[in-house]
């Protein structure tokens, strides 16, 4: 029996040393040479941190583009989805509620034209980006709330479209935080 326990303990200790020690130090070292030193990419306006580029946040004012809903209340410490299936009554109630709320604030939009990403939470609950379609459907509400032309708001959206890598890897996306910051800058001018 001793001949089985000692090798098992050695292997356990070696794995703990490697995965809890060396691997963690390796990842920390890689993070230190990356931009932002592993701290996350903060976004500042006038010297004040207003958010993180890779973390979604809640925008509910009609003057701003809205992010994708979060199942975790945009809490980075609790990142994750709701894990409710599409036939779950609670999930359907949440989605229906989001659709109704969206239609109240976006009177010119038909229910069938709402992109699913604006009423369903992402897997992480912290998605910072929306699609071009999700931005376009919000333009009339924002233009009206800010007293801007729809063309002016659309021009700002166009500047914020991140195209797929090499034209094929991924989809077009728009970072909601940077878009809203630029929208504020354009309105202040």
Question: What does each model-identified segment do?
Answer:
Residues 13, 27, 175-178:
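Hydrophobic side chains within alpha-helical segments
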